[in-house]
Amino acid sequence: MKKIIFLLICCLLAVNVFAASSTQQIEKITQFYGERAGKRAIAWRALIKDSQHLTERQKLNATNTFFNQFVFISDKKLWNHKDYWATSYEFVGIGAGDCEDFSIAKYQALLELGINDNKLRLVYAKDLELNQFHMVVTYYPKPSAIPLVLDNLNNDILPANQRNDLLPLYSFNGSKLWLMKKKGQGQIAGKASRLSLWNDLRNRYQHIKLNQPRNIF
């Protein structure tokens, strides 16, 4: 009986910490980016809270659908930078970003929803139809499985072997970096910390450091 009570107390504490953390995030985004951004932040945190009980496939669908409503805009137009990786806070606050921002926000949301980092990767690829570089999120239900692709340019979550428009170049998650020779696992090339943009983003995310875009879209 004591063990059950202890577990219930732990669960209540976890819920309170989650609520407090979400409230802090919403308030900070609202203060920095305005009321419309605050409404997006509320919807974002509701997605995380309300999707905890879903299956992993349902979590993929909910996350992909939510973020694919945001506006695509290039880093050059938004930040006046050739390449800037926005945190989820910045992406939600602004309501727009490029393919990296869509992918990073989805990746971080899926981690919050309890999907193991070993099942997820951010994949840098060449879009053969658009003839430009692109980033997507992939999900491996099993280590040897063909991954599913979450893409801001395609609302359907398809297996990688059905995405002939994408040529994967390298992929990474929170710990590892892979060089991709085919649409599968790839070869480990070291730690993800080799990517300077990734290190900068993780530092800003950890400290909820927000930046204003140079241009309003």
Predicted regions span which residues?
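Secreted/luminal cysteine- and crosslink-motif detector
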Residues: 11-12, 100
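N-terminal signal peptide c-region/cleavage motif recognized by signal peptidases
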Residues: 14-16
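A structural boundary/capping signal
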Residues: 18-217
